[in-house]
Amino acid sequence: MGIINGKEFIDRLNKLENEIWYDGEKIKGNISEHPAFKGIIKTKSSLYELQTKDELIHEMTYCLPGDHNRIGLSYLQPKTKNDLKKRRTMIEHWARHTHGMMGRSPDYMNTVMMSFASSAELLKDKENCFPEHILDMYEQAAKHDLSFTHTFITPQVNRSQSYFGLSEKPISAKVIDRTEKGLMIHGARLLATQGGLTDEILVFSAPKFFFETDEAYAFSIPSNTKGVKFITRESFVLSDSSFNHPLSSRYEEMDSIVVFDHVLVPWNRVFFYDNVEAAKDFMTKSSFHAFTFHQVVIRQMIKIEFLLGVAQLLVDTINVSEYQHIQEKLSEIIVGLETIKALIDKSENDAQLDEFGYMRPCLIPLQVISTIIPKLYPRFTEIIQLIGASGMVTLPTENAFDSEIREDLDQYLQATNTNAEERVKIFRLAWDLTMSSFGTRQTHYERYFFGDPIRISSRLYTSYPKQEQLNMIKTFLHADTEH
């Protein structure tokens, strides 16, 4: 079958009839028409449409040997550095189309599945592990251009390291039975971004201090599997107006709690279960981090380009480019952007073949980006707020410009080089990016995208090779003092 277009994505999603609860009510009818979801579904469909365009199809898709059906390039298992460059080009195309605002664009989860398949052999001959199921799922996903969400975070009942989930009824999703047909899962998982808006949901074990056997599993099931419900938060879509809410009306992804109510996971969908070692080691020893970090930081690079553009447009609109403190603030963004670009280049240039014959980008530069992004992104949004100042809160709506007060607005909200309506449109973009409920969620999302920033820093420290530097200092200290 191969790649799908935008209409096929929407039609398939509507037919699933996933159980989604919004504001205490179960959604009925086509999910693509619901006010809280139609914006992101339309945007997502445009991504699928993008890969079918004649001018992009060879940069967004590829064919397997002997097969004329085109497959999304996000499923490509890279075997050369040139393959990594191809993947980067594809990721950049999709990220630029959404200005980096869609954290769960299809290529993210496609990359996750690709990384699992590329390292499936790690599970070979391990107890209760089925690497062949991962490979089959990967093949089906690529063949049918399936969309995925994932969930692995447990409910925040008690976050102390010594906490055990000993409640009578499961809170965190657990295996409560093993039957001839498959695993029985009951409980909840937190944070499935775009939960209910995809074909499949990938579920795996969260990193934790103590692992219980009944929580050591990984599987993928259709989002409309009986007993799976997605309970969403309040939508940040405040209107359909691209003037009033230029970003949230397009890119509000929605986040969900996933409830598993005695859900049967067929054996052919189980990747592993009742194996604490696999739950602890597969994510860290596989190519998961290398390939997913590569996708994520490219998207974040594009997003920071967008922030730089918005910041410069504000500067031009209110004519403050001559001030050195403004130049310094914009330079902060430029330095961050160029640093990230250079680190991505280094990760690709230093890529090496792994034990399974796949070209992994060097992880250290990607870890450096993941360590600085939680600091850089909030700072860059703050810079936009500081530049905009009071202009970020004195923002009339689109309707105000179609009312009898239009003359007042034109007079008092004009800018040096543009009219009042255009000025407000620019400032509303900056506000939606940094100060609206959508914008603050974006900041929070990037701050915690890879997990706790402290743990990310700790992981970088423990994995960074420091012996060469230590040897250099020891050699210096023991050098002959006469020389």
Swiss-Prot record:
Binding site for FAD: 150-152, 156-159, 193, 452-455
One MF term in the entry's GO annotations: 4-hydroxyphenylacetate 3-monooxygenase activity
Entry's transmembrane regions: none
Positions contributing to substrate binding: 104-108, 150, 206-207
Metabolic or biological pathway: Aromatic compound metabolism; 4-hydroxyphenylacetate degradation; pyruvate and succinate semialdehyde from 4-hydroxyphenylacetate: step 1/7
Reactions this protein catalyses: 4-hydroxyphenylacetate + FADH2 + O2 = 3,4-dihydroxyphenylacetate + FAD + H2O + H(+)
Keywords: Aromatic hydrocarbons catabolism, FAD, Flavoprotein, Monooxygenase, Oxidoreductase
GO biological process: phenylacetate catabolic process
InterPro entries named in the record: Acyl-CoA_Oxase/DH_mid-dom_sf (IPR046373), AcylCo_DH-like_C (IPR036250), AcylCoA_DH/oxidase_NM_dom_sf (IPR009100), HpaB/PvcC/4-BUDH (IPR004925), HpaB/PvcC/4-BUDH_C (IPR024719), HpaB/PvcC/4-BUDH_N (IPR024674), HpaB_Deino-type (IPR012687)
Pfam families: HpaB (PF03241), HpaB_N (PF11794)
Entry EC number(s): 1.14.14.9
Function: Catalyzes the hydroxylation of 4-hydroxyphenylacetic acid (4HPA), leading to the production of 3,4-dihydroxyphenylacetic acid (DHPA).
Family stated for the protein in its record: Belongs to the FADH(2)-utilizing monooxygenase family.
Protein name: Probable 4-hydroxyphenylacetate 3-monooxygenase
Species this chain originates from: Bacillus subtilis (strain 168)
Lineage of the species this protein comes from: Bacteria, Bacillati, Bacillota, Bacilli, Bacillales
